[in-house]
Amino acid sequence: MAKIMIQGTASSVGKSLIVAALCRIFKQDGYSVCPFKSQNMSLNSYITLDGKEMGRAQVLQAYAAGLEPEVYMNPILLKPTSDKKCQIIVNGKVYGNSTAMGYHNLKLKFKNMLKGHFNKLEEDFDIVVMEGAGSPAEINLRDRDIVNMGMAELVDAPVLLVGDIDKGGVFASLAGTMLLLNEGEKKRVKGTIINKFRGDVEILKPGLDMLEDIIHIPCLGVVPYTRLQLEDEDGAVEFNKKAYAPIDIAVIKMPHISNFTDLDALKSEEDVSIRFITSKEEFKEPDLLVIPGSKNTIEDLLYLRKCGLEESIKEYSKDGKIIGICGGYQVLGSKIKDPHNVETDLGEIDGLNLLDMETTFEKEKVTTRVSAKLLNEETKNTVYGYEIHMGISKYGENIKPLFKIYDKNGEKVDYFDGAINEKGNVMGTYIHGVFDGVVFREKIINELRVKKGLKKKKSQMYEHMREKELDKLADIVRHSLDMEKIYSIIGMK
């Protein structure tokens, strides 16, 4: 089996998409390929067919490889709950909560497990494309590294180092990273990649030659800056502004925002523009307000209260349309109870009181794939998605459920999810990915179109668009990198 590891000079340099591109290229070339990231830190997660939790970046990479996402592609997922603490997910299930130092002391315990997963991949695939995290030059973490050079050494993988020229200082970041690696680590780096370049490559070439003279490693290509409709896991970045998009969707950007990839399908609609808001001054008059998921719902509810957005949301709810997803659904209720101190020691807190329901946080996390019917007079079509939450919500008298769940991890079930008020303009659900399918997205966006005097439109399947974008990404990267050299590095061709 062949393997290659993509590491970067920093977070957000484009490692994840380079891995996705290589997975699609190798697949196009007839090889069986699998992505692998030993440890990921992200609040964007996904539930596999067997009800296990993993990072969204490896989900996209799995699709690029033509595979169903599985937790062995991302055995360890860290989900920050505060600046100093995180929830540790191991093999798709909650391992526990820990401080940064506590997890640092735990890491070596997972080495054998990681090696076991990788050995299985060696048996099942022609090529494994690995991804590092952050930078390999975090010299204070070297002795317990299980995600960058430590992982590369564990499985004897060659490394390509990615630098982001769009941030500026790419030559210094590449040279500085190499300077801080030890001799054994330096030998693993077989090439560099300049990512997100804008302009004429000819102007860059003298710098590439000088860099090669300094670090004695060839540059394998310059990848142009490209806007693609593919999800970004590293942060809730501003969405691309569209020249003309009559439908304005505002999203509350809370401090602990999670699973904002739920919005990707919405931004695929040509006449929809999405913007984040962090203050009441930015609120304005959106056509739709989305309150997304949160890793700390109570803290984010307190944030809404403190910054004045609670007042703006309540005023908007009189005539505007609001959709809450997971944590965003919970804050719409009348009360949130936390008897086990899952998030805070407050015990309970009043919600926005826009939906007649209460949420109680339980000790066990719900992680499940679901299929649901939209409870609507016009359509009974299926919505697919997944749930990741600690809370159980109970309905009051003045409310209606939004969905009926009929399948949970492949088992037949029969229970309600979500809620909608009597007026029909405020609603919420626990289902992540609710907009990915056509049914719910088309219904909601067409309601907004009609309200603005626009014609209804048919929505396209998000996965079809994603496949086209992955092919486009692969084409760009294939023509930007020296693929013949990369095949030589991994011992293929």
From Swiss-Prot:
User: Which Gene3D superfamilies did the record assign?
Assistant: 3.40.50.880, P-loop containing nucleotide triphosphate hydrolases
UniProt cross-references to Pfam families, sorted A to Z: CbiA (PF01656), GATase_3 (PF07685)
A GO MF label: ABC-type vitamin B12 transporter activity
**Active-site residues from the entry:** C326 (nucleophile), H432
Q: Which InterPro entries match?
A: Class_I_gatase-like, CobQ/CobB/MinD/ParA_Nub-bd_dom, CobQ_GATase1, CobQ_N, CobQ_synth, GATase_3, P-loop_NTPase
Single GO BP term: cobalamin biosynthetic process
Q: Its pathway?
A: Cofactor biosynthesis; adenosylcobalamin biosynthesis
Disulfide bond annotation, renumbered to this chain: none
Q: What keywords were assigned to this record?
A: Cobalamin biosynthesis, Glutamine amidotransferase
Q: In what residue span(s) does the GATase cobBQ-type domain sit?
A: 246-440
**Which superkingdom?**
Bacteria
PROSITE patterns the record matches: GATASE_COBBQ
| Family note | Belongs to the CobB/CobQ family. CobQ subfamily.
Function, as annotated, reads: Catalyzes amidations at positions B, D, E, and G on adenosylcobyrinic A,C-diamide. NH(2) groups are provided by glutamine, and one molecule of ATP is hydrogenolyzed for each amidation.
Q: What HAMAP family does UniProt report for this protein, alphabetically?
A: CobQ (MF_00028)
Cross-referenced PANTHER family, in alphabetical order?
Answer: COBYRIC ACID SYNTHASE, DETHIOBIOTIN SYNTHETASE
> What's this protein's name?
Cobyric acid synthase
Q: Which organism is this protein's natural source?
A: Clostridium botulinum (strain Kyoto / Type A2)
Q: Which gene encodes it?
A: cobQ
